């Protein structure tokens, strides 16, 4: 049986005085792809940010285990270095910082954490030129400032490039399909499928079943009112497409 990478135990979390997560339980093993679906306000994005350690959210109770160790007291940057990757729904722009510099710094921070030697600029360039084909981008993309002036599709492909480069143990993709046309969606999905391996795991957070036409998850979880209320296969997402989220509360 494959190793458990992430385990969430009876997790409660809040923003200010508002409790958002109300007893979330989830276990993810190496090699698995999990899709989390649900209506607006159900807690999907909150869950992703709490796993990553976003400071805006307060933990009330419960635990998050990464390879069997609690990460509640670990800072967000240390979680990232350890192998937890979060692709945001709305990637931020970083004026004045080139993609190449940003990616090399991020990669070397992770390598240093792992006790590995840092890549020189030349070594990094050789690696990144291999990875960039994965997301269908030109080399000129590397000299542009991070996400500055990028289209929605370019921003999402940039995050998949980061995911490919960092080789994280668990990647959480928050509404990666949001705002993508069908061609961009196919490119992004191809990259994600290529990166799915027996040694890592992926969480896809999405509103819509269309992403799951291109990336077939092992499990689909439905969130409602801060809890996972139903789990099934990809056919669960297809049922949602037909009947809507109200169907879940009625079954």
Swiss-Prot record:
GO cellular component, one term: chloroplast
Domain ABC transporter: 6-250
Compartment(s) of residence: Plastid, Chloroplast
CDD domains: ABC_FeS_Assembly
Major localisation: plastid
GO MF, one example: ATP binding
Gene3D superfamilies documented for this protein: P-loop containing nucleotide triphosphate hydrolases (3.40.50.300)
Binding residues annotated for ATP, in chain numbering: 38-45
Keywords noted in UniProt: ATP-binding, Chloroplast, Nucleotide-binding, Plastid, Transport
PROSITE patterns: ABC_TRANSPORTER_1, ABC_TRANSPORTER_2
Residue intervals passing through the bilayer: none
Pfam family, one: ABC_tran
NCBIfam families in the record: sufC (TIGR01978)
PANTHER family: ABC TRANSPORTER I FAMILY MEMBER 6, CHLOROPLASTIC
Recorded family membership: Belongs to the ABC transporter superfamily. Ycf16 family.
Protein name, UniProt field: Probable ATP-dependent transporter ycf16
Annotated source species: Pyropia yezoensis (Susabi-nori)
